[in-house]
Amino acid sequence: MVALQIPSLAATVRQDFPILNQEINGHPLVYLDNAATSQKPRAVLEKLMHYYENDNANVHRGAHQLSVRATDAYEAVRNKVAKFINARSPREIVYTRNATEAINLVAYSWGMNNLKAGDEIITTVMEHHSNLVPWQMVAAKTGAVLKFVQLDEQESFDLEHFKTLLSEKTKLVTVVHISNTLGCVNPAEEIAQLAHQAGAKVLVDACQSAPHYPLDVQLIDCDWLVASGHKMCAPTGIGFLYGKEEILEAMPPFFGGGEMIAEVFFDHFTTGELPHKFEAGTPAIAEAIALGAAVDYLTDLGMENIHNYEVELTHYLWQGLGQIPQLRLYGPNPKHGDRAALASFNVAGLHASDVATMVDQDGIAIRSGHHCTQPLHRLFDASGSARASLYFYNTKEEIDLFLQSLQATIRFFSDDDFTV
């Protein structure tokens, strides 16, 4: 594939996203809420329709041609996902509804059966609730103890503090790869290496990295990795869990029912092979097949191309926001190193929801709230924040429109100039 020129990336792909070709309140839609969910290219939408119009049947359960075609398409995606993250085998890819379900699968199947009173789980203060609440539930049941890595002076993962938390009691390190609030890129490879030296297992939440960065689970050497399809151009209702094959083999099923069995008797059952023993019931067939189309789309663009273009956008966004004195920005400045294509902020004297409502009047979609990171916001003494998050179909011109709307919002709520 010929590498796309970075400045032309958005211009090349925007025509693939029908939803972007609309107006909101008389203004062109500027979609800057990609950390919540991405938009879907036409190729993904067409794959959904093709399945329902041509191949709609249950998988693994029929000899007729519709079922055969559906099964072949469904299982082919497992190979694509494995290749996308450089897993050793498609047997290491488990379909889930989303990353939340994937984390809960590990928490209940592995955590409940391997953790005991006094064992320690290390996570961070920046975690999404989906990578915190399940482990709180496990800790409450098993007596395990949660330990939290704090932020450094750049409001990033404090590696030195992490090192002080590791001990022979550490059994699990579960961390977000990229914070959906701070935008910091955590050193997953180094975290995994240090955790393994202490004898702990490692789970990586890749929801914010899988859509934006090349991923290599063998290089990271994590034991599990989770991601949601809807953040990487796929439909809602589909995600995946990667797990090292030998670890998944040792884990009992999370759900029971059809598909996950080998044989069933009146008094017992035997489980099926990997990865099907974790996939009870009729799966999200159409969504999984469409996930494959999304993976194809991202692969064709090139994850390095996507990342490089977004780096340019991130610097442009951060530079513009940094010139507004009323803002309190969260997370590391990109001039200090790699960070994700998002910016969370608060405006002095304004509620984040008011900011989001005002820029929406100009057709600009951003997120307001706590972004499922309430504990992190409490550290900042903030009830929430506004967040603008980018993807490869966004442009500098859209960032300019957002900055203009934000500045107009600040002027609207202020009788005269003010500073923090």
Swiss-Prot record:
It comes from Synechocystis sp. (strain ATCC 27184 / PCC 6803 / Kazusa). PANTHER family: CYSTEINE DESULFURASE, CYSTEINE DESULFURASE 1, CHLOROPLASTIC. Catalyzes the removal of elemental sulfur and selenium atoms from L-cysteine, L-cystine, L-selenocysteine, and L-selenocystine to produce L-alanine. One of its GO terms (biological process) is cysteine metabolic process. The gene is csd. Belongs to the class-V pyridoxal-phosphate-dependent aminotransferase family. Csd subfamily. Its cofactor is pyridoxal 5'-phosphate. This is Probable cysteine desulfurase. The modification N6-(pyridoxal phosphate)lysine is found at residue 231. Gene3D superfamilies: Aspartate Aminotransferase, domain 1 (3.90.1150.10), Type I PLP-dependent aspartate aminotransferase-like (Major domain) (3.40.640.10). The active site is at residue 372. It catalyses: (sulfur carrier)-H + L-cysteine = (sulfur carrier)-SH + L-alanine. Keywords: Pyridoxal phosphate, Transferase. Pfam families: Aminotran_5. The keyword Signal does not apply. InterPro entries: Aminotrans_V_dom, Cys_dSase_SufS, PyrdxlP-dep_Trfase, PyrdxlP-dep_Trfase_major, PyrdxlP-dep_Trfase_small. SUPFAM superfamilies: PLP-dependent transferases (SSF53383). GO terms for molecular function: cysteine desulfurase activity; pyridoxal phosphate binding. Its EC number is 2.8.1.7.
